[in-house]
Amino acid sequence: MEKKKNLEQDCIFRIVIIGYDYECGIKSLLKKFTLGEFSPFPESQVGVDFDIKTINVDNQDIKLQIWPQNKYFNDTSDKRDFLYKGAHGYLLVYGCHSQKSFDNLLNDWMVQIDKFSNEFSKRNLVLVCNNSETPETYMTKPNYLVDSNITKQWANSKNIPFFEINPKENFNVDEPFIQLARLIKNQNFINSTK
């Protein structure tokens, strides 16, 4: 009973957003999710930064500490350990206009997660196709360049939830975060009852 009671107290989950390629639109996604605002040209952040937002998942308030992946995190083992070993789960984001961003998730970031993450966080992944108008895609690339059928098949083969989002239109922006928090919460409950 004590373990269940602890779970019902305030939960703080560290979420890492992977996909630092410029065309992924992570900054636009975060600004829309945390502040409710959209900007196709958000300001660059320098240094280590994270956002916090409290959401309700299955009648429980959960505080998300959201760390956008920074390409400089992998410079040293200390930064890498902080990113991967401290995470509860990952939002894997690629830009629908950039095949390279999806390829990098498969060929680089999934390898990094598998190699450096703890066993708990490896099970908590959500794949996100971001149709975000970044400076490269704004009014220049109106169609998807990444075949969503292929990405959906890949996600299904790994048992990873898949979402298509559009921060500009406020389409599906909250859902990937809610689903990831639910995965973490359910894994946390399963682990606490063992």
UniProtKB/Swiss-Prot annotation:
Q: Which UniProt keywords apply?
A: GTP-binding, Nucleotide-binding
Q: Cellular component GO terms, alphabetically?
A: endomembrane system
GO terms for biological process? intracellular protein transport
Q: Which residues bind GTP?
A: 19-27, 68-72, 130-133
| Pfam family, any one | Ras
Motif (Effector region) on chain:
42-50
- InterPro entries recorded: P-loop_NTPase (IPR027417), Small_GTPase (IPR001806), Small_GTPase_Rab (IPR050305)
Q: Does the keyword GTP-binding apply?
A: yes
Q: What is this protein called?
A: Ras-related protein RabU
Q: What taxonomic lineage is listed for the species of origin?
A: Eukaryota, Amoebozoa, Evosea, Eumycetozoa, Dictyostelia
What gene does the UniProt entry assign to this protein?
rabU
